Amino acid sequence: MAKAGTVAASRLRLTRRAMLRAIGGIAITGIARPAVALQRDISFTLPWIPEGPNLITFVAKANGYWSKAGLNVDIAKGSGSVGAAQAIGNGQFQFGLSAATAGLQQAALGLPIVQISCCSYDAFMGMITMGDTGVIEPKDLEGKKFATTTKSGEFPFIPAFAQKAGLDLSKVEILQVDPNVRQRLLIEKQVSAISGFAPSIVPGYIVNGFSPRIIRFSKFGLPLYGNALFTQQALLEREAELCGAIAYGLNEAMKFVLLQPEESLAIFFKANPEMELAKGAHELNKLALDFFRYSSIHEGAKKHGIGYAPPDDYNVMTDLVMKYVAPDGKRPDFDGTVSNKFAGAVHLTDTDWSNVKLSLSNVTKLLT
């Protein structure tokens, strides 16, 4: 039989543990809750359907990078980056991914949105052609047909690309078509090139036996970044610790995806079993993921840590958005629209970065 003093000490220790757990709950949620109810529900939107460029969210959730901070993140499908940015900015979702340019556009139009982690340094906007079209450089498109979609995110930047690349668009027959028609026209050789986001188009061509080539806008001095993590300015000001937990968890997931792509794919398919049913599903999603991994290699991330947003590139990107996308908007200030507060905690070694780059020959061979 235990002594009374022993029982009292045991009860005291339990009480202290419970108290510490409660204090942890206050740190994350601002509200003291019982230990069994520490998980806080968080709403999160993707910019599109589950795919390679947003696979990191499923890794962050499955690997517990968010739940260890007491966060239960519900991931919703999106219908486009602009729609995702709008939904985040107006508070429909607390967090989400969207193309960096879409976030800047909405900020210019007055939406109170702020970026808290840079995930991709290249959206792979560009011209997509086939190996037998004779189009190797942009100027080769002169005298040929080119298909594009007006509602696609790269469309507004085609004039800037043409100017930088020395392409005279007046000498190109431009067809404005539906996205599905656009991709078919290239296969049927009715056009010599199309515009679009390579990670969403090229893997499907590869799986079906075609030989696409990509001419990236970024190759010609247009830093048009891919997915970034966004929230509302008010939430960042009010709950910086919560925003940091979401950003840190996503940055940890980026590191995992960069170093362990096959394990990341397995997590993705487990979370989205319907994505494994398509023809060539593994090859298709692996290539889409590798586009993302390729786009995550940047001197800013190497020097300052995963999630870092380089101010100079963002200023150029903002100039492009103001000129071609939101000319009637108010130019957003970098410090008020982009935060590097949560970058710097997650790093790869120089050897890791080199090995990641060596593993991406499947992407490199597609670039002109």
Predicted regions and their residues:
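N-terminal secretory signal peptides
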Residues: M1-L14, A18, A22-T29
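N-terminal signal peptide c-region/cleavage motif recognized by signal peptidases
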Residues: A32-P34
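Short, glycine-/small- and polar/acidic-enriched structural segments
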Residues: A37-P199, I215-R216, L222-P223, T368
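Short linear loop/turn motifs
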Residues: D74, V82, Q176, K219-F220, ...
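Pocket-lining segment of extracytoplasmic ligand-binding domains
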Residues: T101, V181-Q183, Q190-G280
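Secondary-structure end/capping motifs
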Residues: E239-P327
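Conserved C-terminal helix/tail region of periplasmic/extracytoplasmic solute-binding proteins
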Residues: Y314-T368
